[in-house]
């Protein structure tokens, strides 16, 4: 059985609507595949859905078989009719004029985590380390989601919820576990290889909005490595108006900045449609 829908989300199936799709279909007892132009992916992996590059007016087909296949197809149709939970059609992001601000310049660099490739532990011990670090990072994301909600920043809360789904992808853990088995490396080395490859896949997309998601993957890699390597990371504290200078900045870092003191952020890399830019705009 299958059902095809035409996507009406302005920015296609980016992280937030894709995470809604993953969550909804995960509740049904059925074997499912999503298909676009002959390419199929499992709906369990939000990253594989994103890499399909499902855009506005594209046709997406759900193929399902099993005890609850019919129910899954009905839910899929309802999701599409509801724009996968996006209540408003958002226009494509555009560069906006920035009002003049002043403050002391501070060059920010995230803490670097030292990653060793060779492991002295068993494969099972490294797998346990990786699962624990992922669990800690998922808890971090739940905390950031709650913080954003408490501040009335519902859009940002939805982004961190999407990050949670990005990280909680069984295919990522499976790929890292395979590396651990074959190369007998450390958990941090295996995880770094898997997420760097995923980041590069996003950067190679020709859709600007999806391409900018690489910074979300880099953010998740950094947060997980901090736990794996037990690296201490503290954001600098400012007591006077400051303008942050950086090559790039992680979305989760932006949320932790005090907008009453950090008056502006100037990046030499990044993208106007990155989550960091969205967070900065929301916090102004």
What is the meaning of each model-derived region?
Residues 7, 38:
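Generic anion/oxyanion-binding catalytic loop in active/binding sites
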Residues 1:
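Mid-to-C-terminal polyanion-binding domains and interfaces
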Residues 4, 11, 16-19, 23-26, ...:
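Non-catalytic, soluble scaffold/interaction modules
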Residues 30-33, 39-42, 51:
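Nucleotide-binding motor/catalytic cores of P-loop/tubulin-like NTPases across gene-expression machines
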